[in-house]
């Protein structure tokens, strides 16, 4: 029997959503001439930017800390002299964090929060600004803006169904400007050129930033493909740009002629996530192809082979990662990268074993797969719970782990109940 009250509430919600959509469309039909119109109060903006650096830049690296903060100080002193590309970076940083900054009081506009609504306005304005930029020369700032735009969309669940398409588009953009190639080749190609701007483009600082951004883009694309159920586009590509170094931003100066030596993985830096993640990238990409390619049928022995390789990668994690896996407190800066390193490998154990776990009641050999699925799903949910308990909601918005793991747990319980009843 249909509840009349529930029916009226649903009707009112639909009407409210449609009215807000029309109002939003009218408001955004006017092109924003100056991006600085959308900037928040400096105190509020500084808090959100600091939060971004404590959370987001501990995993996917887009910006260089000293360079950014130097420009931000100049912006605070002389806002009128700030370039539009830096304004776009500020807007997108704020857009990335507005929905997860717990200290802000939540209010609503229509069916969405004011924070999300204003973040989406900034996203749309920056997207429009990017479309008007020349492609003759692509600066490192424009590349950073494109990556931040993608992350901001994911953090605000904006155009969720387009996530994989936009990740693939971002990857193609990176390929088009040669981020996947060895920066040393650029020096050889322009060695005889006297243009100082070109020489500066291949400085040690920019070489490392190119590697970081490329590593970030391929990680985002692989995860988007995994969530969508497609093989990653990176499978058919080869890159020779190398992996990022395990060095902190304070050691990477813009005028550096040479990079300092990369620290061992046991030493945590803000770049540790990308460095350690790159070691298992080929394996994760291969497993993603096996899971999502309908022409591939993985035998159980083959499954156990990939299970063994995945466990080896998990066991090779440095001590600081293992500490966070065992510790319930996830408030430190290194907690998010540590737990994400574990989650992004364990998610493959879940989907590799799931097809066999479904038949555990008919073949006792597959009972192991059911146990692996339960353990993997439970561990992933525990990691997310730790982060949420510490006030960090980043992965909840950026990934689908909680939904996927919860479904796997429910499915396993239902299968177990059906076997019990028989």
Residue map of PLM features:
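Conserved small-domain helix->loop->beta segment predominantly found in fold-type I
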Residues: 321-328
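Amphipathic helix-loop-helix modules that constitute alpha-helical solenoid scaffolds
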Residues: 22, 211, 215, 245-247, ...
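Extended, leucine-rich alpha-helical cores of fungal transcription factors
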Residues: 31-46, 72-94, 99, 108-186, ...
């Amino acid at each position: 029997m249909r509840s009349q009250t529930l029916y009226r509430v649903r009707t009112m919600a639909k009407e409210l959503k449609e009215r807000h959509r029309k109002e939003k469309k009218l408001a955004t039909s006017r092109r924003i001439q100056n991006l600085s119109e959308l900037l928040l109060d400096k105190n509020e903006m500084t808090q959100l930017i600091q939060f971004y650096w404590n959370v987001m830049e501990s995993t996917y690296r887009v910006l260089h800390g000293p360079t950014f903060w130097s420009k931000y100080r100049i912006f605070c002193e002389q806002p009128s002299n700030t370039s539009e590309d830096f304004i776009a970076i500020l807007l997108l940083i704020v857009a990335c964090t507005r929905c997860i900054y717990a200290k802000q009081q939540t209010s609503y506009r229509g069916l969405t929060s004011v924070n999300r609504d204003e973040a989406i306005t900034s996203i749309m304005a920056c997207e429009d600004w990017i479309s008007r930029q020349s492609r003759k020369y692509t600066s490192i700032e424009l590349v950073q803006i494109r990556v931040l735009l993608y992350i901001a969309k994911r953090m605000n669940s904006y155009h969720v169904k387009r996530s994989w398409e936009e990740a693939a588009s971002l990857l193609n953009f990176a390929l088009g400007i040669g981020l996947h190639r060895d920066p040393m080749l650029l020096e050889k190609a322009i060695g005889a050129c006297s243009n100082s701007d070109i020489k500066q483009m291949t400085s040690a600082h920019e070489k490392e930033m190119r590697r970081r951004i490329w590593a970030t883009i391929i990680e985002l694309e692989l995860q988007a493909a995994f969530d969508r159920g497609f093989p990653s586009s990176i499978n058919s590509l080869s890159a020779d740009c190398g992996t990022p170094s395990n060095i902190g931003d304070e050691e990477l100066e813009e005028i550096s002629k040479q990079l300092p030596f990369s620290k061992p993985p046991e030493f945590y830096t803000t770049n540790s996530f990308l460095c350690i993640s790159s070691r298992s990238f080929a394996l994760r990409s291969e497993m993603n192809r096996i899971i999502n390619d309908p022409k591939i049928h993985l035998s159980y022995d083959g499954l156990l082979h990939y299970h063994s390789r995945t466990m080896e990668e998990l066991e090779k994690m440095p001590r600081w990662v293992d500490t966070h896996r065992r510790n319930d407190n996830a408030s430190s800066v290194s907690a998010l990268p540590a737990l994400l390193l574990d989650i992004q490998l364990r998610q493959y154990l879940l989907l590799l074993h799931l097809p066999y776990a479904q038949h555990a009641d008919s073949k006792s050999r597959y009972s192991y797969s059911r146990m692996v699925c339960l353990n993997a799903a439970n561990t992933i949910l525990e990691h997310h719970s730790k982060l949420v308990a510490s006030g960090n909601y980043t992965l909840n918005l950026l990934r689908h782990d909680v939904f996927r793991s919860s479904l796997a747990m429910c499915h396993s319980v239902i299968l177990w109940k059906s076997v019990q009843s028989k």
